[in-house]
């Protein structure tokens, strides 16, 4: 088993608080733009430590930092922000490398002590062709094609395409994932997907996750044009009602054979295009038994009850985020990220 796979297995298959990054990219980010890393740590209240390494890769671990309580879904959002920052750093590093290649080519071209002697001069003047009276000139020729990539950059790009990101060796029996088009050794990606059904490169989810929500529940949807949510006053409101009768816990629940009480939950979405998109995703999550689970209530401390399962719903029309209501400008975006983490997307 490769180092990357062993790290994934060691963190229970979820790796929710770990990120792998190539050493050159991490060194570039931490040395050239440390302020951006410091800002990410401060905004998301996390520490970022090197948890392991190979000759080419660091495994970074994110941990909550600062006084409790930690923000909801904080590690997931911090990990996503860090991956975005690393992607930007990788682009900047490649740009710097290209500029270095160009300067090296100019130096090899004979810069010497008087580089101005080697600069290309203006093109020679040419006599314009004689045209008959009234004739129009031909359109200018198309611009020349850009020069090909320097050999080293071309080799780097080809090496990336033929190197497996998991074992870091040459790809054997290449398998390309359908949605994100990342390629791996067939054996490597087969084992990786057994640990977690997501692309090790981008985190794109594959397969269908099924939860342990009680199967006897119903999701009822209605629309109220007279009920207006703050910040969405020009739209009506989608009212979602989740209804569960009492039942007995099954084998997939914490205490099989123990009874749980019934419950009814109500949630609200704006009846706008994005709100209806979230409604469609909520239906998928409910059908896959991911919206609720059975456990201990976070508000009452009562065990063996039906509880929310980390897909946040607005259970109040007003009051803002503190009272699980509106206005909350980023809620629809955040909840789609939570759904995406469970493999619920609109494609």
Curated annotation (Swiss-Prot):
Single GO MF descriptor: transferase activity
Keywords: Cytoplasm, Metal-binding, Notch signaling pathway, Transferase, Ubl conjugation pathway, Zinc, Zinc-finger
Compositional bias (Pro residues): 120-151
Keyword Transcription regulation on entry: no
InterPro entries, sorted: Deltex_C, Deltex_C_sf, Deltex_fam, Znf_RING, Znf_RING/FYVE/PHD, Znf_RING_CS
Gene Ontology biological-process annotations: Notch signaling pathway; protein ubiquitination
E.C. code: 2.3.2.27
Zinc finger residue ranges, RING-type: 164-205
Catalysed reactions, semicolon-separated: S-ubiquitinyl-[E2 ubiquitin-conjugating enzyme]-L-cysteine + [acceptor protein]-L-lysine = [E2 ubiquitin-conjugating enzyme]-L-cysteine + N(6)-ubiquitinyl-[acceptor protein]-L-lysine
A GO cellular component annotation in the UniProt record: cytoplasm
Keyword tRNA-binding set for record: no
Gene3D superfamilies registered for this protein in UniProt: 3.30.390.130, Zinc/RING finger domain, C3HC4 (zinc finger) (3.30.40.10)
Organism superkingdom: Eukaryota
Chief location category: cytoplasm
Subunit structure: Homodimer. May form a heterodimer with other members of the Deltex family. Interacts with NOTCH1.
Family statement: Belongs to the Deltex family.
Described purpose of this protein according to its UniProt entry: Regulator of Notch signaling, a signaling pathway involved in cell-cell communications that regulates a broad spectrum of cell-fate determinations. Probably acts both as a positive and negative regulator of Notch, depending on the developmental and cell context. Functions as a ubiquitin ligase protein in vitro, suggesting that it may regulate the Notch pathway via some ubiquitin ligase activity.
Protein's name in the database: Probable E3 ubiquitin-protein ligase DTX3
Taxonomic source organism: Mus musculus
């Amino acid at each position: 088993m490769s180092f990357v796979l062993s790290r994934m297995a060691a963190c229970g298959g979820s790796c929710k608080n770990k990120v792998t990054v190539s050493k050159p990219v991490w060194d570039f980010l931490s040395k050239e733009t440390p302020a951006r890393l410091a800002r990410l740590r401060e905004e998301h209240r996390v520490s970022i430590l090197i948890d392991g390494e190979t000759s080419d890769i660091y495994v970074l671990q994110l941990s909550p930092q600062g006084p409790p309580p930690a923000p909801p879904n904080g590690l997931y959002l911090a990990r996503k922000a860090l991956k975005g920052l690393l992607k930007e750093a990788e682009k900047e590093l490649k740009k710097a490398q290209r500029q270095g290649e160009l300067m090296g080519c100019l130096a090899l071209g004979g810069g010497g002590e008087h580089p101005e002697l080697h600069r290309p001069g203006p093109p020679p003047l040419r006599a314009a062709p004689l045209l008959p009276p009234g004739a129009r000139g031909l359109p200018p020729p198309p611009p020349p094609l850009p020069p090909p990539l320097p050999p080293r950059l071309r080799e780097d790009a080809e090496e990336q395409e033929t190197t497996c990101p998991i074992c870091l060796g040459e790809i054997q029996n290449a398998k390309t994932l359908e949605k994100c088009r990342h390629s791996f050794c067939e054996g490597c990606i087969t084992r990786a997907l057994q640990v977690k059904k997501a692309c090790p490169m981008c985190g794109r989810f594959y397969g269908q996750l099924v939860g342990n929500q009680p199967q006897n529940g119903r999701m009822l949807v209605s629309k109220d044009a007279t009920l207006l949510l703050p910040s969405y006053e020009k739209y009506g409101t989608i009212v979602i009602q989740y209804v569960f009768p009492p039942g007995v816990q099954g084998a997939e629940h914490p205490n099989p054979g123990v009874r749980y009480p019934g419950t009814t939950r109500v949630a609200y979405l704006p009846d706008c295009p994005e709100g209806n998109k979230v409604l469609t995703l909520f239906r998928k999550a409910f059908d896959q038994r991911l919206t609720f689970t059975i456990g201990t209530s976070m508000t009452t401390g009562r065990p063996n009850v039906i509880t929310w399962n980390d897909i946040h719903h607005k259970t109040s029309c007003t009051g803002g985020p503190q009272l699980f209501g509106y206005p909350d400008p980023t809620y629809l975006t955040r909840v789609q990220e939570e759904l995406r983490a469970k493999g619920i997307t609109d494609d």
